[in-house]
């Protein structure tokens, strides 16, 4: 496997001495004699707790990359190893506590052999799924040793050096993947110079990791050029998210997701649910989150018409009867949200926000428009019912008194209101860590505010977050071991003299059981949707 050094004409092969184009034509070939044309994009299997319900959502990031590559003439195939092997759950290395969901190696190998990719790209978002990514890299090397390999996603971006310890990996993509992947493909085919390729990490012939800075966020660039991809894409500073094609929905096995029906939100009205993003980025700076680090600190929106066009395409071509907005903060731009919700009313489909909304940018008018336009379920990511914890440890700009009013108002409109809470925040920036009493106060707040249901999570120091940096600095986690086994149901943060991770995990589990077991929270989404019809 080979990768351009992006700073010279030299290429490295599995840590062996560097080769040059043409030195090994049977493996690499010259750009003018071999075209890197066929791209296999893989979503890896998922390793989860035995008693978890595996949520199965579309790998939209791969869909966007596939759409851009196809626009420029590349042949693409998406294989969602997790979804296609959803019913194949196997213990992990003899550990009955965890199950791995996904296709068997034989099934994956069969797809690789039949497609014969020139390039294999793998999604690497979560650190606790890294083993599954590296297993796919091993299979790719065994089956298609001449193929070039790359990974991208949050884990890959924050740990490029560790990822490149894998001899089966050629490149790590940093940041947003659409333009980075496209320019890299064009570079492999000799259509762009080294200077035009950015956002990639690789090992040079001396084994040192080299990193080229990331491209600007996509809101400030636009690919232009012929559909054939026979010439280099041009960068324009006039573009925005609307210039990215819709995800390549035709490369997903849509019927498989409809059959599984394990969408991110368990409260669904329809059975054929579509998912989409209307924006990227966030203006908040929550310590546990990485959205601002990966997607930017400014909100980047798609136009209302572009969003509606995608919903209509999903409805008309794939028969969706419900859609979910995957944005972290769909109401961050309140004026834009109003326009969007009015347009959703014309679409006439039920919809939900399982990822959450920006409650600090929410009012009664927006909730009215949401209910009128078909929103039957809304998720409010409160994080804590204690103002001190929000301000000093989480840094989320919420006023809990105002938030309580909005929760009750949304319930009065007939919407199911789900809450997200995090417990077990350690000392941060000189502020005292969250006490057990404050965690109980969060639970009490959820009860008093009137949530229909709630999820309580043990604080998890995910890669790239301020929380992780503080935990490492203060010795509250072991980054060499904990991060690769971390889930939101495990407590891996240990604060001596205050509490340990196991205690927090048990408390979160108790809160979830107690809060959601109440009979008066029984909920039938179809009845709620019927009640909201306009």
Swiss-Prot record:
Could you state one GO cellular component term attached to this entry?
Answer: cytosol
- Per its UniProt record, what CDD domains does this chain match? Radical_SAM, radical_SAM_B12_BD
- BP GO terms, sorted: antibiotic biosynthetic process; methylation
Residues in Radical SAM core domain copies: 268-496
Q: Which reaction does it catalyse?
A: cytidine 5'-{[hydroxy(2-hydroxyethyl)phosphonoyl]phosphate} + AH2 + 2 S-adenosyl-L-methionine = cytidine 5'-({hydroxy[(S)-2-hydroxypropyl]phosphonoyl}phosphate) + 5'-deoxyadenosine + L-methionine + A + S-adenosyl-L-homocysteine + 2 H(+)
The biological pathway it contributes to is: Antibiotic biosynthesis; fosfomycin biosynthesis
Q: EC number(s) of the enzyme?
A: 2.1.1.308
Cofactor binding: number and manner: Binds 1 [4Fe-4S] cluster. The cluster is coordinated with 3 cysteines and an exchangeable S-adenosyl-L-methionine.
Name of the protein this chain belongs to: Cytidylyl-2-hydroxyethylphosphonate methyltransferase
Organism, as annotated: Streptomyces wedmorensis
Gene, per the UniProt record: fom3
């Amino acid at each position: 496997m080979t990768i351009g050094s992006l700073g010279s004409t030299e290429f490295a092969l599995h840590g062996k001495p560097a080769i040059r184009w043409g030195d090994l034509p049977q493996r690499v070939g010259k750009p003018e004699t071999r075209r890197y044309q066929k791209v296999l994009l893989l979503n890896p299997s998922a390793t989860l707790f035995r008693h978890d319900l595996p949520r199965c959502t579309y790998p939209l990031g791969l869909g966007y990359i596939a759409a851009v590559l196809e626009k420029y003439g590349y042949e693409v195939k998406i294989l969602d190893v997790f979804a296609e092997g959803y019913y194949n759950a196997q213990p992990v290395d003899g550990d009955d506590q965890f199950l791995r969901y996904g296709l068997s190696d034989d099934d994956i190998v069969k797809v690789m052999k039949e497609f014969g990719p020139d390039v294999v790209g793998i999604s690497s978002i979560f650190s606790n799924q890294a083993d599954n990514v590296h297993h796919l890299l091993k299979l790719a090397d065994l089956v298609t040793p001449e193929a070039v390999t790359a990974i991208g996603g949050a884990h890959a971006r924050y740990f490029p050096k560790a990822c490149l310890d894998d001899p089966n990996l050629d490149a790590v993509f940093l940041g947003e993947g659409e333009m980075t992947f496209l320019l890299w493909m064009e570079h492999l085919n000799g259509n762009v110079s080294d200077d035009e390729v950015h956002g990639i990490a690789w090992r040079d012939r001396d084994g040192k990791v080299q990193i080229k800075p990331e491209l600007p966020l996509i809101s400030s660039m636009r690919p232009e050029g012929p559909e054939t991809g026979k010439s280099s894409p041009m960068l324009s500073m006039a573009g925005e998210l609307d210039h990215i094609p819709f995800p390549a929905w035709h490369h997903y096995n849509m019927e498989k997701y409809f059959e599984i029906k394990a969408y991110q939100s368990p409260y669904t009205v329809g059975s054929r649910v579509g998912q989409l993003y209307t924006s990227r980025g966030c203006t908040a700076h929550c310590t546990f989150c990485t959205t601002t680090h990966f997607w930017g600190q400014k909100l980047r929106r798609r136009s209302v018409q572009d969003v509606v066009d995608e919903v209509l395409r999903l409805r008309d071509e794939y028969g969706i009867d419900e859609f979910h907005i995957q944005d972290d903060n769909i109401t961050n731009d309140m004026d834009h949200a109003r326009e969007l919700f009015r347009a959703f009313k014309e679409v006439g489909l039920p919809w939900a926000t399982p990822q959450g909304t920006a409650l600090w940018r929410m009012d009664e008018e927006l909730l009215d428009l949401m209910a009128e336009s078909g929103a039957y379920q809304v998720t409010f990511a409160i994080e804590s019912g204690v103002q001190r914890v929000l301000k000093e440890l989480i840094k989320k700009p919420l006023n809990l008194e105002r938030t309580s009013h909005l929760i009750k108002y949304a319930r009065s409109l007939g919407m199911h209101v789900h809450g997200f809470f995090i417990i077990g925040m350690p000392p941060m920036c000189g502020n005292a860590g969250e006490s057990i009493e404050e965690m109980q106060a969060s639970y009490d707040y959820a009860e008093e505010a009137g949530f229909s249901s709630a999820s309580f999570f043990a604080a998890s120091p995910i890669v790239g977050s301020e929380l992780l940096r503080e935990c490492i600095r203060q010795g509250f986690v072991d980054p060499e071991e904990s991060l690769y086994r971390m889930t939101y149901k495990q407590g891996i943060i240990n604060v001596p003299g205050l509490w340990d991770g196991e205690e927090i995990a048990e408390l979160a589990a108790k809160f979830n059981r107690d809060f959601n077991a109440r009979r008066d929270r029984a909920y039938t989404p179809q009845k709620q949707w019927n009640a909201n019809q306009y």
